[in-house]
């Protein structure tokens, strides 16, 4: 029996909302006296507590360390001779940072370092001419200029990503369609501004809508951010076009794979996906799994089944053969589609949420509606992850049979 869980289970709260502005603790307010200083602190901290700011800083530092260490470790694997490993990695980290700047900004950074090292040197010429070199002010100004240039680039990129994110939201449904005998809910949380995950629920043709035959899709493009988002957009367009021709599911997946293979950069840009057709009149669901995390069917009695029939991910082999399969949904059943970002989410100890915890969460699902079930599952993930920075796109689609 469906019920409103809003008072019992919080909804799926994005990372940024989970660190929402709050009033600083009294100890902080006592230390920051005066209206202007207090207002300044509120402005730069957005009202977040010191422990939240520290968690955010450590998450940023950990992500940056991992980003730069990728180059450092790769370089160290190639060149192991000579200096101690610490020195080699420190050198590689330095050059990894420097070479990510434009040539002009590299010159500014090196000049600032030279002036910083040169500051404090004492000089004498004869008995009358003596003094100290002090370029601290010039060094600070150069570093501030470099920071301003980098921030300008970041703000511009962020604005472009926000526009891309807005466009991407047009490609996925804003709300689930109404389906006789079933309740549907979905949600997606990108790691970055744009995502490589794709979900959909639509009637491919007018006759399908009249018959109530619904297409359900979840997919995950290899890679992240802009490249994955662009490939996701082409996948969505080609899927809708082919599905609109009324092709059977087995033929649809073959044609979609051929298209994906022709635009996969020799198999480097592949896509995992699950496509399903649901007929409310018979409660029959036909599906095909193209190398994706298998959707999990939880029966009303608590038993679980994995939907694994299918074939290779899209875009790897243009001649791949796919197998379709069918299941029958019964009253009280729940079908959960999800991407690998769910099971690969990790906590502050770098421990993955994993398939076992995910299965346990699905087995523990109360007899609620699709939206409440979705919130229940995602809360399990959020409780495990805490405030650890998200490492991949997370998408989930839930179908509850009435």
Task: Please place each PLM-identified region on the residue numbering.
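Regulatory and interdomain segments flanking nucleotide-handling catalytic cores
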Residues: 12, 20-28, 101, 105, ...
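Intrinsically disordered, low-complexity Ser/Thr/Pro-rich tracts
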Residues: 6-9, 260, 264, 345
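Non-catalytic regulatory/interaction regions at protein termini and inter-domain linkers
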Residues: 2-103, 371-383
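C-terminal catalytic subdomain
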Residues: 12, 21-36, 53, 325, ...
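… and, occasionally, acidic/histidine-rich disordered N-termini of signaling adaptors
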Residues: 68-80, 149-336, 386-402
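N-proximal short alpha-helices
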Residues: 130-145, 225, 229, 247, ...
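Alpha-helical transmembrane segments and their helix-membrane boundary motifs
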Residues: 75-153
């Amino acid at each position: 029996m469906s019920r409103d869980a809003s008072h019992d289970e919080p909804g799926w709260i994005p990372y940024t909302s989970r660190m929402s502005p709050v009033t600083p603790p009294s100890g902080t307010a006592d230390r920051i006296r005066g209206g202007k200083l207090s207002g300044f602190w509120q402005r730069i901290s957005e009202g977040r507590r010191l422990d939240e700011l520290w968690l955010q800083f450590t998450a940023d530092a950990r992500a940056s360390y991992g980003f730069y260490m990728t180059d450092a470790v790769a370089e160290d694997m190639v060149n192991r001779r000579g200096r101690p490993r610490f020195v080699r990695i420190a050198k590689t980290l330095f050059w990894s940072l420097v070479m990510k700047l434009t040539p002009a900004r590299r010159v500014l950074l090196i000049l600032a370092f030279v002036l910083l090292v040169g500051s404090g040197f004492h000089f004498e010429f004869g008995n009358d001419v003596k003094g100290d070199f002090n370029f601290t002010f010039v060094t600070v100004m150069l570093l501030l200029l470099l920071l301003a240039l980098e921030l300008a680039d970041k703000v511009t990129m962020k604005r472009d990503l926000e526009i891309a994110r807005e466009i991407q939201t047009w490609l996925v449904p804003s709300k689930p369609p109404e389906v006789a005998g079933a309740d549907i809910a979905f949600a997606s949380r990108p790691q970055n501004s744009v995502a490589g995950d794709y979900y959909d629920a639509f009637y491919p043709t007018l006759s399908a809508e009249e018959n109530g035959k619904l297409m359900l899709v979840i997919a995950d493009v290899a890679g992240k951010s802009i490249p994955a988002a662009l490939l996701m957009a082409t996948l969505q367009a080609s899927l809708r076009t082919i599905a609109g021709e009324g092709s059977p599911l087995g033929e649809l997946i073959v044609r979609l794979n051929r298209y994906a293979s022709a635009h996969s950069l020799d198999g480097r840009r592949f896509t995992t996906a699950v496509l399903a057709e649901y007929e409310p009149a018979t409660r029959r669901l036909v599906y095909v799994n193209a190398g994706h995390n298998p959707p999990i069917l939880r029966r009303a009695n608590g038993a679980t089944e994995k939907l694994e029939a299918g074939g290779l991910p899209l875009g790897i082999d243009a001649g791949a053969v796919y197998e379709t399969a069918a299941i029958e949904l019964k009253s009280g059943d729940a079908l959960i589609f999800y991407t690998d970002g769910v099971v690969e989410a990790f906590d502050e100890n770098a421990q993955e949420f994993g398939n076992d915890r995910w299965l346990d969460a699905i087995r523990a699902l109360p007899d609620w509606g699709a939206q409440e079930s979705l919130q229940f599952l995602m809360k399990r993930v959020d409780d495990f992850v805490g405030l650890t920075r998200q490492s991949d796109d997370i998408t989930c689609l839930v179908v509850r049979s009435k």
